[in-house]
Amino acid sequence: MKIKDLNKYYDKLQLEYGEPTLSSIYNGGCENNPDICFVFMNPTGKNVASTKEWKGRRSPWIGTKNIWKLFYNVGLIEKELFDKIQSMKATEWDEEFADYVYSKVEEKKFYITNLGKCTQIDARPLPDSVLKQYLELLYKEIDIIKPKKIIVFGNQVSTIFLGKKICVKSVRKEEFKIEINKKEYPVYAVFYPIGNGMRNIDLAIEDIKYIMNK
């Protein structure tokens, strides 16, 4: 099975749980044993790749700015690309530039995905019951790419992914283990660094640097 083989399942779930005028957002980056797999919550309409008019890749954070501050500050994108992203309006991203950005993500050996692939019109929280519909698909995704380390963002995603109650501020830099298809992966829970979580971005950066160097 390949990563793209999962997309049809995400598209079906989008119709059930997402905004019907928007498309599902999948994933992107290094698909072959990346150094880190970053697992966020779910996409919103701020991602310009979620529009029906978009013809290119449907990867996380296309057309946004703040998350790239995190990736720049942990050394995963170069300053030239970061400055270009910060200078661009969302509508200035096109399919070619999105491919270029993700080619750089791939070069740096990291992978970006969300637990929930159902795009919402805004950043409203999703109930656990919806995110859990995607859990087995995320496990399949991880089994395909086989990352060296997994970073999950925020209490809700960390709790669902690990199957135990997680409070990120209490487990900073702590390594958990998860077994997927008989292979064990190290997992770290990190503060969610976007939206209301922007106040914690410096703590997220600190923890990710620690995890990368461990």
Task: Please report, for each region that a protein language model flagged, where it lies by residue.
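A hydrophobic alpha-helix/topogenic segment detector
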Residues: 16, 172-214
